[in-house]
Every structure is written in structure tokens, then in C-alpha cells.
Amino acid sequence: MDFLTLMENKLDEGRMITFEEAVELAKGKIEDEKLFLLADKLCKKNMGRRVDLCSIINAKSGGCSENCKFCAQSGHYDTGVKIYPLLDVDDVLKAAKENEKEGVHRFSLVTSGKSVSDEEFEKILGIYSVLRKETNLKLCASLGSLSYERAVRLKEAGVSMYHHNIETCREYYPKICDTHTYDDRINTVKNAAKAGLEICCGGIIGMGESMEQRIKMAFEIRELGVKSVPINVLNPIKGTPFENVRSLSPDEILRTIALFRLIMPYAHIRYAGGRMCLGEHQSKGFKAGVSAMLVGNYLTTVGNKISDDLEMIQRMGLEI
């Protein structure tokens, strides 16, 4: 019995693969198509055929105190990004309703900065209260570092999921940021989970890390009990330290997605920022383990039209 069949049998029995097994799967001895086929089978079995759709609004942009080397919104780099304060409730509500009309299931406010001020947080709570009354969207939040007390208040305001990426694995984290620690990110995830919020936590691939380090990130995310795992592909931004990083090939991106699916068989593996790097191969992700997708525009880059994404999903025989 070959190694891939052994892994398939193990996953069929509801058991989880180990780090060593995932590294073995990643070595390239197994044909991509066979790996994708197993990831797709596992995805459809555990997650069904309905693609979970979310959208975001850049509710506060630029001027961030942190020095994450990939980020256009860091105040440490000259990227030409727009800088503006927290949006008013009317602007957010308008965007939310437009996204809901397009068929989106989830909607999140995303703010720049390590965290938001007390005044901003109170305003954000008010915005979520309005969104809960005026839409049927599931509400998510991505407000940076979060205390347990704030997490409780977000849940009371109607937020069901908190997004906070670990970005990369623990050992590679010092290569991407040194104004806060990897453990700061872990603590935020744990605070949100303790308050009863579902967790959306993933990272960025293509920042110079190895495939083994991506696998380490996946296992670190798995340990956190995450429900949604956004996979972003680095979109090198001019002015950031990572502006000249080599782009990943479509095959490497898809192989990473498939491995994440095998490592986390019961979580949503979510297409997120940078999937445009796949070009005409974007639809292949839905045959390699993707079960969810961030649609519309991203924080500082433009995405596909939502209608084009919906058409792609339907073309793949999936549901919305």
C-alpha cells in the first residue's frame, strides 16, 4: 500500500495526520493531481459543496505603528497607501448591504493598527449593533490585538467570528516583524476563543518561508482549534521590504492549499488575498481543498468582481 493511500485511510477513519507525515506528503514524490484529488474528496466529505463567502471593509486605513514587512499599511514604509480614520456607520452599512445583495454570507470590519483606541472601539460596537439590526449577515471583526474583555463586548454586539492571523510559523515570525511577538498574536486568538467567538486565523505564504515552515504554521493553527483558515498569497507591495520577493508558482500555491486541507480536514480553508496570483488557475483551488472565499476587494488591493467569483463557483458545480 503506497503512502498516500495510507494517509487516505487514516483520514477516512477520522484520525489526523502528523507533522512528519505532512512533510513526507510535501516532498514532491506524490503527483500533484493525486494529492489534489484526496484534498478535494476530504473537503467535500467534511465541508459539503456550499462555499462560505465573506467580504471585508477597510474601516480604518494606514498609519500602523507595526513594522510587518509585507504590509502596505505600516507607517514604517512609504507605500502611497490611503490613510483615513474610522469610517462612519452609514458608509459601513452601505457596503454591508451591497455585499449582502451580492450573495455574501459574512461581513467584517478590518482596522489598521496594532489595536483600536477606546473611543474607536465604542464606535465600532455601535456600528455592529446597527449591522445586526439592518442586515442578515454573519458579522466578523478584525481589529488587531484584543483583550478578553473587548472580545466579550464584541460578542454581545453581534459579532460571531474574530479574525487574527498568525501570518507565519513561530520560527519564521522574527523575519517578518519585530514590533510585536508571535505570542502577542496567539494571546489575541485565545482571548477571542475564551469569549466564545469562532476563530478565523491563517497566514501569508510566499514571504520567503520554506514549505516545511508553511506546514509548521498549519499545525500551529490546528492547535488553536480554528474554524476558518484564510490562505493569503504575498502580493509584493512597492515600498515594503518584501517588494522584490519571488512570487510562488500556481502549482506551489495549490499544493500548499491541499496540504492545509489534509492537516485541517474540518476547518474552512479560505481563499483570501493574493489569489489573483493564480490567474486562470484560481478555479483549481476548489479541486484542491478550498471550501470558503474572501470576495470583493481586499484591504489595499483590488480583487475579482463578486459576480465573476460567483460564476466561477457555480461553474465548478458548487453551491453558494
From Swiss-Prot:
Keywords: 2Fe-2S, 4Fe-4S, Biotin biosynthesis, Iron, Iron-sulfur, Metal-binding, S-adenosyl-L-methionine, Transferase. [4Fe-4S] cluster binds at C64, C68, C71. [2Fe-2S] cluster binds at S108, C140, C200, R270. The keyword 4Fe-4S applies. Its EC number is 2.8.1.6. Binds 1 [4Fe-4S] cluster. The cluster is coordinated with 3 cysteines and an exchangeable S-adenosyl-L-methionine. Binds 1 [2Fe-2S] cluster. The cluster is coordinated with 3 cysteines and 1 arginine. One of its GO terms (molecular function) is biotin synthase activity. InterPro entries: Aldolase_TIM, BATS_dom, Biotin_synth/BioAB, Biotin_synthase, Elp3/MiaA/NifB-like_rSAM, rSAM. It comes from the Bacteria. SUPFAM superfamilies: Radical SAM enzymes (SSF102114). Pathway: Cofactor biosynthesis; biotin biosynthesis; biotin from 7,8-diaminononanoate: step 2/2. It catalyses: (4R,5S)-dethiobiotin + (sulfur carrier)-SH + 2 reduced [2Fe-2S]-[ferredoxin] + 2 S-adenosyl-L-methionine = (sulfur carrier)-H + biotin + 2 5'-deoxyadenosine + 2 L-methionine + 2 oxidized [2Fe-2S]-[ferredoxin]. It is an enzyme of class 2 (transferase). One of its GO terms (biological process) is biotin biosynthetic process. Residues 46-275 form the Radical SAM core domain. Its cofactor is [4Fe-4S] cluster; [2Fe-2S] cluster. PANTHER family: BIOTIN SYNTHASE (PTHR22976), BIOTIN SYNTHASE, MITOCHONDRIAL (PTHR22976:SF2). Belongs to the radical SAM superfamily. Biotin synthase family. Homodimer. Catalyzes the conversion of dethiobiotin (DTB) to biotin by the insertion of a sulfur atom into dethiobiotin via a radical-based mechanism. This is Biotin synthase.
